[in-house]
Amino acid sequence: YGAIREQMDQLDKDNIPYDVVPGVSSFCGAAAALKAEYTLPNVSQSVIITRMAGKTPVPEKEEIALLAAHQATMVIFLSTGMLEQLSQRLLAGGYQTDTPAAIVYKATWNDEKVCHCTVATLAQTAKEHNITKTALIIVGNCLGNEYDRSLLYHPSFTHEFRKGTSES
């Protein structure tokens, strides 16, 4: 959610050389702060990174309720000031009121805050913690306690480095 493409286009137009240096996105920092894995077996294998429409619209097909219908893990940027509407759109898309959610304020900063809540309590939680901007909203059952263990470490699972054993 920046303007790097426009900046690179201008640099190219002006024949100014540049490098693009990769960084760690705040959505990864938020996962670390939450001590969470966004993809869990039989919970969610996809992560949707998006934002609410605000001063800048989003394409119609990327409306929050349509994306929420996938029931994937969602990481929502630039939407902290619209949490009542966000909750409504998430519920309209099929999440339940008690779906786990979190607000991560200033992920990876010294003054980081991590607030666990539900889809229904997003706005209330932000208000209680005086969070009005600079936060990510994470939604999905990846934040819950129910998941299946990965087959990767199951003794009967064969992969490149190990032949599975049959269980008795």
For each predicted feature, which ranges?
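Short glycine-cluster motifs
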Residues: 1-53
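A contiguous loop/helix-start segment that scaffolds small-molecule binding in enzyme catalytic cores
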Residues: 2-10, 14, 44-46, 54-168
